[in-house]
A protein has these predicted regions:
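Transmembrane beta-strands of outer-membrane beta-barrel pores
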Residues: 30-34, 73-77, 110-114, 146-152, ...
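Residue-level signature of outer-membrane beta-barrel architecture
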Residues: 57-59, 96, 112, 134, ...
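Membrane-embedded beta-strand positions of outer-membrane beta-barrel proteins
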Residues: 26-28, 69, 92, 106, ...
Length: 175
């Protein structure tokens, strides 16, 4: 956990020197999450509704390209209690402005599971994230993202495979 926080701070500080107009902010939103099983699910597999909250730095690399490292809490997984997975995540989004109000974003994400640590589910998760951002005003924005897990959530000794998928609908404020 300390390593992820240190990495987030290091990313924010290191990009500060490259950026022409750094922005910082917070975002929060609603998650619709599910586990995508390879084959037949172990149990009934219903999606989980949850929330996310976090903060970010956004650093312009050019007029139309920016990088935005984030640190967020995200409630994901599935509805069944054993599959409720909460993560502290570090997405690094590369944003491509396509107009004054719209931007496309994509990037990698690493996550550390919080709460239960020895439950047969891996403590680290790696994902890809893609989405769109809509500028509401100079400071407010809305976004929609899709997260696709790259790694099996189960430990190697569990005879099942599943990845975490997530739709995020968010609102944010830039300082």
């Amino acid at each position: 956990m300390k390593k992820i926080i240190f990495l987030a701070v290091l990313l924010c500080v290191s990009f500060y020197g490259f950026s022409q107009d750094p922005k910082y902010g917070v975002r929060t939103g609603y998650n619709i999450s599910n586990l995508d099983f390879d084959g037949t699910p172990i149990n009934e597999n219903k999606h989980r509704n949850g929330f996310m909250i976090g903060f970010f730095g956004e650093y312009s690399l050019s007029k139309s390209v920016a990088v935005a490292p984030e640190l967020q809490f995200s409630a994901e997984g599935a509805k069944r209690e054993a599959f409720k997975l909460d993560y502290i995540q570090l997405p690094v989004m590369f944003k491509f402005r396509i107009s004054e109000r719209f931007a496309l974003a994509a990037g990698p994400q690493a996550g550390v599971k919080v709460h239960k640590t020895e439950d047969g589910i891996k403590n680290f998760a790696y994902s890809g994230v893609a989405g769109i951002e809509i500028k509401i005003s100079h400071q407010f924005f809305a976004d929609a993202r899709y997260t696709y897990g790259f790694t099996n959530i189960f430990e190697d000794y569990i005879p099942a495979e599943a990845i975490n998928t997530n739709i995020q609908l968010g609102l944010g404020f830039k300082f």
